[in-house]
Amino acid sequence: FLRRACDFAARRGADPAWHPRSTAEAFFIAPLLAAAELFGCERYAAAAARAADHYAARHLSMDEPYWGGTLDASGEDKEGAWAAFQGFLALYEHTRDAEWLRRAQHAADVCLSYTVVWDIPLPAGRLADRGLRTRGWTSVSPQNQHLDVYGVLYAPELYRLGTYTNDENLQSLARVMYRSCGQLIDPWGRQGEQIQQTNFAQRGD
């Protein structure tokens, strides 16, 4: 299955007419590199680098923000930045080229612009009653303003970025992001991946 998926992604990325609509296809980069190492297939690594160069050209200037990582937002979002961040960092780890590290830092900075670094006073309700702390959680996009635990998914990469750049602040924040998500692990009840920390709600038309 992995070979078929990577063959598809590599063929798609090699097409001169390939011009993805959003940053979402950057999620192909890291798996392509993993497959390149697993199968010894340089074609996968070349496809990953081509895709990453494409997204760097589109987004490093921020003339076009990272976007398209979520299913339900029509503008820029954290997940789009994470797609590029994980891809750029994977290429740095694959090549040790400092330019990929610089690009990873840029995408990580955008991811972190969505990170809450304080405890928001929550509206009355169950989460406030349980003393939920929002430090280390992330907002989704300017359109979807709730918080989610999505940051835990890139906390390991953020920690590694801190290691590569000798930035203890990044490592410390990554630990906070990773540990914070455990607050909603409970044997009773359930809670979706998002919480509403404001009195604002989107009602639709």
Role assignments for model-derived ranges:
Residues 1-205:
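Glycan-recognition and catalytic cores of secretory/periplasmic carbohydrate-active enzymes
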